[in-house]
Structures are given as C-alpha cells and as structure tokens.
C-alpha cells in the first residue's frame, strides 16, 4: 500500500514531514499555513496551488440553521460585516465546513513542489482555472496568496 498524506495532516515543518516519513508515507501535501521553505524532506512534496481553503469545521449544522432545513448536498453562504461571503458545505451527517471567501492562487508562481493540487469546491466551471494553471497564469477574480509570498513567491518561468 502507498500512503499519501493530504493537507489535513498539517505538515508545517521538517519535523512533521520526518514523522510522516517514519510512518511510511511516500508523499505529503504541505500545509497551506506553512511557509514554502519550511518543509525539507525526501518525500514527494505537494502544494495546493488553487482552492478555497477550509477555515473551520463545525459539528453544528450551519446549513440547517441558515436554510431552515437540510438535505443531501446542501450548502449555504455566511456573510461577514465586510460583505465577504464564505461558502459552507456539509461534509457528512450534519458536520459543516466553512471555506475562505476567496481561493488561494499560486498557479503563476514557482512553488518548488514535486506535485501540485487544484482543490475545487464551489466552482461552477473549473476550466478557466485549469487553463490558467496550464499557462502559468493567475485566474481572473479575487484571490489570496496565503503565506506563500511572505517567504518566496517567485514567478514561474514560461
């Protein structure tokens, strides 16, 4: 069996990567909350280069509270005082995930990763994002760079 660790392992440094390595993982997805140079490892390093990051998980069914009911595949939006809308999606049962109001975008930057992940959640048409990724551009619209540009954030060579 080949073990791959996703972002929920919260691999933020070389020590946590070494722990994954010692437990038989062949690849890890570096936490979006990590600075790009923080994880040194022999494992295959993956970065999420596009996607609205989960901000919070809650056992309270937010969707039911907002929509006055809950069904399969249901979702809702939370709006903050600035007018930003945060998608809320049901995970399983009545557990909810609140996602960032804008996606993290690194599609036009050199991440130094061995593999890159496009993390789709609420996109109606993922094709523009895929095209932007393949041509090393940032897609249209609002986005964040997260922690990535705080450390490095070099433009990709074309």
Predicted features along the sequence, with ranges:
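Active-site pocket-lining/capping segments in soluble small-molecule metabolic enzymes
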Residues: 1-158
């Amino acid at each position: 069996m080949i073990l791959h660790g996703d972002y929920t392992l919260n691999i933020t440094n070389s020590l946590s990567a070494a722990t994954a390595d010692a437990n038989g993982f062949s690849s890890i997805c570096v936490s979006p909350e990590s600075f790009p140079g923080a994880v040194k490892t022999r494992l295959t390093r993956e970065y999420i280069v596009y996607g609205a990051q989960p901000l919070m998980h809650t056992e309270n069914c937010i969707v039911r509270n907002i929509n006055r009911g809950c069904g399969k595949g249901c979702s809702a939006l939370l709006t903050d005082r600035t007018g930003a809308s945060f998608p809320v999606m049901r995970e399983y049962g009545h557990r909810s995930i609140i996602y960032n109001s804008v996606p993290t975008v690194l599609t036009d930057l050199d991440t130094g990763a061995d593999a890159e992940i496009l993390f789709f959640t609420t996109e109606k048409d993922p094709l523009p994002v895929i095209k932007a990724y393949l041509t090393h551009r940032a897609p249209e619209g609002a986005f964040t760079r997260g922690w990535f540009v705080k450390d490095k954030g070099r433009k990709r060579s074309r």
